[in-house]
Amino acid sequence: MAGFTDLREKLKSMTPHRDKVFEYSNGEKRKYRESDDDESEYEERRDAEARRVKSGIKQASIFTLEECARIEAKIDEVVAKADKGLYREHTVDRAPLRNKYFFGEGYTYGAQLEKRGPGQERLYSKGEVDDIPDWVHELVIDRLVTHGVIPEGFVNSAVINDYQPGGCIVSHVDPIHIFERPIVSVSFFSDSALCFGCKFLFKPIRVSEPVLHLPVRRGSVTVLSGYAADDITHCIRPQDIKERRAVIILRKTRADAPRLDSNSLSPSIVSPKRRHILKAKRSHRKADPDAAHRPRVLEMDKELQRRSLSSRQRRHDDGSSENSWRRADDREPAARYTHDHAPTRRVKMRRH
């Protein structure tokens, strides 16, 4: 990590020759374009997919600068309340350089369940997250209804994503079995971009060229449906978050969306006592946009070093070395392993 102060710098240094590798949306790879015909075919396929993505996107500039400032002040109030521990347990989800605040409905990511992967996401039980604040209805949702963006009564889930410079969210599709379409988002604090069809990889961290790079301006509304919502992933790249940025995501949950039962939770996050302790510690952490991502990147570097070790060294590992690096977005670090559930494994944690 020496010499790097931001994920964006590490990305740039790790992919100086990325033009030599091209990826199609169906996952096949071709190294080096062998002829003009190959290049033409590649461009045609990329352009065709970009047109399909665009067909499912609508954007509008609805909020004035004054309205943005008022809403941004309310977002700051949400952050302050979360830092004081005033929200319910599952309302707040923290990750390096990105915090999420769930209102109305909250849901687990696949990695928080014993059975992991796409399609395993579940809504929390009713009442597990705080209600949608009145100001979200009055300042945001009602304005979108007035402009015909969404019908009245559509939204029952509001999520605020608060990014610091260099923050990101990996490529994903909003769970189809959880949320109706469209997916509506409103951007605040600064301009950014939404990218479609990226291969977002770690170890080392790198992001491929997107099928479509969609600028999103402060105060703009973005609506995803059809191909853009269901048939291609979208992400926020570290290099596209140059200043603090927040987005309010407004969705409607499906009537038949599955909900959690206690048996579905990973053992490491079941204990109410343990969750209470984590909440108290978490609420007093100070945001440090220059440092919060450093353990994440250092662990990636350590993983590369560990892979170079001989099999003999791995066989004689006494279990006291650090565990393989896990994606920081999967879950809170202190909740990944506990002495109660994994007494023979130990993780060295860094505090800020």
UniProtKB/Swiss-Prot annotation:
Span list, region Disordered: 18-47, 260-352
Annotated InterPro entries: AlkB-like, AlkB-like_sf, ALKBH5
Biased composition, class Basic residues, residue ranges: 272-285
Catalytic activity: an N(6)-methyladenosine in mRNA + 2-oxoglutarate + O2 = an adenosine in mRNA + formaldehyde + succinate + CO2
Compartments in which it is found: Nucleus speckle
Keyword list, A-Z: Dioxygenase, Disulfide bond, Iron, Metal-binding, Nucleus, Oxidoreductase
EC number(s) stated in the UniProt entry for this protein: 1.14.11.53
Chief site of localization: nucleus
One CC-aspect GO term: paraspeckles
Cofactor(s) essential for the protein: Fe(2+)
Enzyme class of the recorded protein, top EC level: oxidoreductase
Cofactor note: Binds 1 Fe(2+) ion per subunit.
Cystine bridges: C198-C235
MF terms in GO: 2-oxoglutarate-dependent dioxygenase activity; metal ion binding; molecular condensate scaffold activity; mRNA N6-methyladenosine dioxygenase activity; oxidative RNA demethylase activity
Gene3D superfamilies: Alpha-ketoglutarate-dependent dioxygenase AlkB-like (2.60.120.590)
Residues binding Fe cation, per UniProt: H172, D174, H234
Superkingdom to which the source organism belongs: Eukaryota
Compositionally biased spans, kind Basic and acidic residues: 18-34, 286-306, 315-343
Function: Dioxygenase that specifically demethylates N(6)-methyladenosine (m6A) RNA, the most prevalent internal modification of messenger RNA (mRNA) in higher eukaryotes. Demethylates RNA by oxidative demethylation, which requires molecular oxygen, alpha-ketoglutarate and iron. Demethylation of m6A mRNA affects mRNA processing, translation and export.
Assembly and oligomerization: Monomer.
Domain-level remarks: The C-terminal disordered region undergoes liquid-liquid phase separation (LLPS) for the formation of paraspeckle membraneless compartment.
PANTHER family for this protein: RNA DEMETHYLASE ALKBH5
Name of the protein: RNA demethylase ALKBH5
Originating species: Danio rerio (Zebrafish)
Gene behind this protein: alkbh5
